[in-house]
Amino acid sequence: MKNLINYFIIPTILSFAFAFEIPDAIGYNGVVVCSKKEAAQIGIDILKKGGNAIDASVGVAFALAVTHPSAGNIGGGGFAMIRLANGDVTSFDFRETAPSLAYENMFLDSLNNVIPGKSKYTSWAAGVPGSVHGLGTIHKKFGSLPWDVLVYPSVNLARFGFELDLHNIIILNSERYKKLLANDIVSKKIFTKDVDYKIGDLLIQKDLSLTLERIAKYGYKEFYEGKTSDYIIECMNRTGGLISRNDLRNYKSVEREPITFSYRGYTIHSMPPPSSGGITLASIL
């Protein structure tokens, strides 16, 4: 592989404990590690087509947007730590940014008390998404396969569905998430049903497949300037969110110099701020 990458999307913290049997994994010439087998398989297939680690990471990230959106999604943001074959190390910050209309006390009432849930469960809590821009940026700079080759497998995964596993059904069947998903007319239509989900049920996400298809066909900027951006603005207008069209058009990923430190003779490279990971690791070690 020409490039090596560690790719991170900040996950939603879930208050569940899972006990899974972890199978042995053996690979040659490349390894793909993620939380869903469907996403891992897409990454493996990309490597077999001659793609590098960046290509595989992009494909896996879009697949996780279908199968495990709290670990990778097109509506959030993330970081990428990249080490090239020549030893060069760099990082990319594509975390969400605050909308231009955001202000200091937006989650407080007139008495300066926190408004419960407003900073978590409303459109006011939504930052300008960075995931698609970040994935497009690292692919443009380091990828080898065409963009659509990396994204289209996830189009099909959303269109034809994937089988739910234990992790999926625990979340979808929980009263907390049932309530949250039912609060919006779009997510209610897609995810809520009269009976609980079962392991092996097929989850089809037609609208997501259409969005991913546009991104695959027209490139990552479609998300910020094309029809997908129209849908985002429509959602903001419908739910009272703050993200504007200019916020989307002006979003930029940022390449940053990694934090570098030593531990027991090893050189460690990690993500700089706004990630807290690198600083925390350097402080602990």
Kindly give the residue locations of the regions a language model identified.
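Bacterial N-terminal signal peptides
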Residues: 6-15
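Noncatalytic scaffold domains of N-terminal-nucleophile
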Residues: 20-41, 45, 53-218, 223-225, ...
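N-terminal secretory signal peptides that target proteins for export/translocation
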Residues: 1-2
